[in-house]
UniProtKB/Swiss-Prot annotation:
Known function: Involved in DNA repair and RecF pathway recombination.
Record family assignment: Belongs to the RecO family.
InterPro entries documented for this protein: DNA_rep/recomb_RecO_N, NA-bd_OB-fold, RecO, RecO_C
Assigned keywords, A-Z: DNA damage, DNA recombination, DNA repair
Database matches in Pfam families: RecO_C, RecO_N
Gene3D superfamilies: Nucleic acid-binding proteins (2.40.50.140), Recombination protein O, C-terminal domain (1.20.1440.120)
Protein name per the record: DNA repair protein RecO
HAMAP family tied to this protein: RecO
Cellular component terms (Gene Ontology): bacterial nucleoid
Gene Ontology biological process terms, A to Z: DNA recombination; double-strand break repair
Amino acid sequence: MAAAHRVSHEPAYVLHRYDWSESSLILEVFTRHHGRIALVAKGAKRPSSNFRPVLLPLQPLQLNYGGDAEIRTLKGAEWMGGHVMPTGEALLSGYYVNELLLRLLARDDAHEALFDAYAGVVQVLAGDHAGAQAATQAAALRAFELLLLREVGLLPSLDVQTLTLEPLVADARYTLVPEAGLRLAAEGEAALSGADWQSLQGVLDDRAPFTATLREIATMNAGSNSALRNQLRALLNYHCGVSTLRTRQMMRDLQAL
C-alpha cells in the first residue's frame, strides 16, 4: 500500500468548521499551496485539545496533515500570530470573504496569489494597517472580490468591451453584467468610466495586485465606489447562484436592529 500523502508547515486559514462527532471537527481550510481542502481535527472539541484554541477563522495558521481521502487528517496546527481577530462589522466582512471562497473555489485547486490577497484583506479587517477605517476596509473587499473573480476565470478583461473586443473610450460609461461582461451602460445603470475600468485592469496586472488594486479603489470617489460595489455584488451573486449571500443578509439584519 502506498504511503499516505503528508503535508507539513503549510500556511492556511480556517474558512469554516462544523461538528463531526462528539469530540471532533471537520474543517474547510484554504491553504497556500494546495487550495481549499477538508480536514478532520480529531479530538479538537475536548477541553484538553491543543487544537481547541488554535482552529479559529481569520487567523494565520501553519498546518501539518496527511491522508489520500477527500477529507484528510489534521496532525498539527500552530498559530502564526501577526494580528488579532477582527471585530464588529469587520468580523462579518471576514465571514463574507470566507463564504465567497467556499462557494467559488473548487477543492484541491491552488491559488497562491489569491491566498496572499486573502491574507492581505484579513490584515486590513483586523486593523493591522494603522488607522484602518471603513473606507479602507471597503476598498480591500472590492480588491479581493476582483482578484477572486479573476482567479476563478469569471472576470472579463476590463480594458475592452467583452462581446466586441472594442477598446474602451476613456470618458464613456460601461457596466459589468453577468451575462455579457463589460458593455456600454444604458441610462441609469450602475457604471464606471472607461478610464476607471482601464485603471483597474492595470492594477490587477501589477506584481502586487491586491495592494495596487486596494490603493486604486481607495482613490475613487464615493459614487464610483458605490457603482463598483453594486456591479461586483450582482456578478458574485450570479455566480454563487444566490440572490443574497448569507453573510450579507446577516449584515442587513444587524443594521436594521
